[in-house]
Regions:
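Catalytic Walker B motif of ABC-type/P-loop ATPase nucleotide-binding domains
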Residues: 50-54
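Helical segment within the ABC ATPase nucleotide-binding domain
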Residues: 65-77
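ABC ATPase "signature
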Residues: 109-110
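A short, surface-exposed alpha-helical micro-motif characterized by mixed small hydrophobic
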Residues: 91-93
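Conserved ABC nucleotide-binding domain
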Residues: 11, 15-28
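Single conserved hydrophobic/aromatic residue that forms the stacking wall/gate
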Residues: 1-9, 14
């Protein structure tokens, strides 16, 4: 499969020079390139809600920085993003609300301030992990 050039409009695609690889089969793409392609596909139709699983895995620092900006921009104009991550610093910087799930069960949720208080999200997570062992 190839990506039709008419669908290439994303700033991320242009900045990360993915356009030079658009004639290649997607199966030949690296994990990071596939991740960028999935992000472009999610954003290309200007959604109000995006759900992502570990969106930063496989991204280079430049692409990760751009994605964070895209996420913040979508939320700033009234959109919403649900995403899972094990990188708690990213969640702490990006999220207005957070939920911590363990073993498929919700163990804490609320605004970032409600969940973490004066602690870091990582400290709260580790405390909850220790308490449930």
């Amino acid at each position: 499969y190839e990506i039709p050039l008419r669908l290439v409009g994303s700033e991320m695609c242009i900045r990360d020079r993915l356009t030079g690889d658009l004639g290649q089969p997607i199966s030949a793409y690296s994990h990071g390139m596939k991740q960028k392609l999935a992000i472009i596909a999610a954003w290309i139709h200007d959604p109000k809600l995006i759900i992502m699983d570990e969106p930063f895995v496989g991204l280079d620092p430049k692409a990760a920085h751009l994605l964070k900006g895209m996420m913040r921009e979508l939320c700033d104009v009234g959109g919403a993003i649900f995403f899972s991550t094990h990188v708690l610093e990213v969640a702490e910087k990006l999220c207005d609300k957070v939920a911590i799930i363990k073993g498929g069960r919700l163990i804490r949720s609320g605004t970032m301030e409600e969940v973490k208080g004066d602690d870091s999200l990582e400290d709260v997570f580790l405390e909850l992990e220790d308490a449930s062992c």
